[in-house]
């Protein structure tokens, strides 16, 4: 039996981060966590990280697709926060972002890590952006690095 596993060290990786401006006070913490994980744990060089800001979570898939198709990046980390309100808007935005990002990864073959918080409240979002529940931006960054290495191992 062959087993493929990978670690998160990827010092030569080129990683793009797409990040939503809407709910920026939360997303800034996700970005800090992602960059810290990439550089400190993954050993990615700061010059090999590109950050692209978009208006909101719904716009993440299009920017992520452009980055994935550019051939310049080994992975893309998508960061944002969608907080449920009193209308169906949450479902449209969260579902559109989630489905769109999954499609980008499948269509491009470039790992896309999902670091979009979908929460019931601002408090839940804050907890997941570096307080009680860890930092989901950091987790997404590490997922991207691991997937870079998994795909390399599969192709080897």
Swiss-Prot record:
GO terms for cellular component: cytoplasm; cytosol; riboflavin synthase complex. It is an enzyme of class 2 (transferase). 5-amino-6-(D-ribitylamino)uracil binds at residues 22, 57-59, 81-83, 114. GO terms for biological process: riboflavin biosynthetic process. One of its GO terms (molecular function) is 6,7-dimethyl-8-ribityllumazine synthase activity. Forms an icosahedral capsid composed of 60 subunits, arranged as a dodecamer of pentamers. This is 6,7-dimethyl-8-ribityllumazine synthase. The gene is ribH.
């Amino acid at each position: 039996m062959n087993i493929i596993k990978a670690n998160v060290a990827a010092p030569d990786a080129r990683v793009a981060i797409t990040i939503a401006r809407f709910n920026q006070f939360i997303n800034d913490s996700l970005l800090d966590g992602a960059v810290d994980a990439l550089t400190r744990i993954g050993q990615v060089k700061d010059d090999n990280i590109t950050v692209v800001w978009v208006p909101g979570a719904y716009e993440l898939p299009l920017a992520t697709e452009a980055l994935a198709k550019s051939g310049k990046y080994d992975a893309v980390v998508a960061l944002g926060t969608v907080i449920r309100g009193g209308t169906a808007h949450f479902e449209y935005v969260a579902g559109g972002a989630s489905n769109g990002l999954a499609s980008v990864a499948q269509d491009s073959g470039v790992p896309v890590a999902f670091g979009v918080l979908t929460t019931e409240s601002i408090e839940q979002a804050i907890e997941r952006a570096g307080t009680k529940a860890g930092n989901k931006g950091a987790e997404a960054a590490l997922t991207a690095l691991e997937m870079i290495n998994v795909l390399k191992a599969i192709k080897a």
